[in-house]
Structures are given as structure tokens and as C-alpha cells.
From Swiss-Prot:
PROSITE patterns (alphabetical): RIBOSOMAL_L5
Its biological purpose: This is one of the proteins that bind and probably mediate the attachment of the 5S RNA into the large ribosomal subunit, where it forms part of the central protuberance. In the 70S ribosome it contacts protein S13 of the 30S subunit (bridge B1b), connecting the 2 subunits; this bridge is implicated in subunit movement. Contacts the P site tRNA; the 5S rRNA and some of its associated proteins might help stabilize positioning of ribosome-bound tRNAs.
Protein's recorded name: Large ribosomal subunit protein uL5
Lineage start: Bacteria, Bacillati, Mycoplasmatota, Mollicutes, Acholeplasmatales
Organism per entry: Aster yellows witches'-broom phytoplasma (strain AYWB)
GO biological process, one term: translation
Length: 181
């Protein structure tokens, strides 16, 4: 994934707005986005491990780096799941890749979601982190619809250094996240 300069935001404006809004004394108090974690759980991997190869390839395409395969922490007999079995993949984005992904998410991906009217403002965890779920991976421009074998969802967690939800919501609004009214 090539990271272009026009795909980034003007952080001096974001910092100035947040300092004015929350009356921070120092620039170091201003919250920022720490990392973005993209997770795809694959329940079918219990019966067919080769399904994970497609998920890993799709995550690699949309994030620009290799994902890590996640394994089951404990056995659940009803699901025929044993401890240590591969059940998904995740990727953690920081730095320039994080910025490019957030830009792409807010400007390209979310508007392509079917029946999109804005994201919920209730998905904060109380510590300034935001969780977002997408039902289909085909909304990303890098994913070729013809090569997708099965439509899968994913979780996107945006971890911020904000102390509470109001600071984090204002930060993400300045990043361009389209929240519902």
C-alpha cells in the first residue's frame, strides 16, 4: 500500500481545536490515535484450515502488512474447538499505515457500506477506545469481489490516548468519522 501525502490530515488544526475545546495547558495532553487493530474471526477454520489463507490474504491487501493468526485460548466441546486451534487473524496498524487506513476508512470505505447513515456513538469502551464492526470485507477498494469466496465481517478497534469517551469522540470527529446525530 503506497502512502501518499494527500491521504493524511493536518494535525496542527486537530491539536489546536482539541486544545481550545478541552482547555489543555500542554500539547502533550492532547489525545491522539495510538493504533488500529483489525480482527477477522473465522469459525469455518475449525473444519477447514485453508479458509484462513484467504482471510490472511484479504487482511494483507487492505492493511498493507502481514496479519497474525489468532488461536483459541480454551477448548469448547460444543463447537468442536480445541485449545490452540487457529480461529482467525488480526493486524495492528501504527504510524503511517494507521493514518492511511483511517483516511481510507472515513473517506472511502464507510460511505460504501450498504444503508449507511453514520456510525454509532455508543461503541466507546469508557476509556476512549472505539470499536466498529463491518459486515462485509468487499467495501474495501483493494478487495476484488470476483475473487472473494465468502463474505466475512471484521472488527476494527481504534485505540486512542484519550481519558474518556467525549475526548475520543471529538478526536475521531476531527479525523472525519461520520457519527450519527
Amino acid at each position: 500500500m503506497s502512502i501518499k501525502k494527500e491521504n493524511t490530515l493536518d494535525y496542527s488544526k486537530i491539536t489546536a481545536t482539541l486544545m481550545k475545546t478541552f482547555n489543555y495547558k500542554s500539547v502533550m495532553q492532547v489525545p491522539k490515535v495510538d493504533k488500529v487493530v483489525i480482527n477477522m474471526g473465522v469459525g469455518d477454520a475449525i473444519f477447514n484450515v485453508k479458509v484462513l489463507d484467504d482471510v490472511v490474504e484479504e487482511l494483507k491487501l487492505l492493511s498493507g502488512q502481514s496479519p497474525v493468526i489468532t488461536k483459541a485460548k480454551k477448548a469448547i466441546s460444543n463447537f468442536k474447538l480445541r485449545e490452540g486451534m487457529p480461529i482467525g487473524a488480526k493486524v495492528t496498524l501504527r504510524g503511517a499505515r494507521k493514518e492511511a487506513f483511517l483516511y481510507k476508512l472515513t473517506r472511502l470505505v464507510l460511505p460504501r457500506v450498504r444503508d449507511f447513515r453514520g456510525i454509532s456513538g455508543k461503541s466507546f469502551d469508557g476509556r476512549g477506545n472505539y470499536a466498529l464492526g463491518l459486515k462485509e470485507q468487499i467495501v474495501f477498494p483493494e478487495i476484488n469481489i470476483d475473487k472473494v469466496k465468502k463474505i466475512r465481517g471484521m472488527d476494527i478497534i481504534i485505540v486512542t490516548t484519550a481519558k474518556n469517551n467525549t475526548q475520543a469522540k471529538k478526536l475521531l470527529e476531527l479525523y472525519g468519522m461520520p457519527f450519527k446525530n
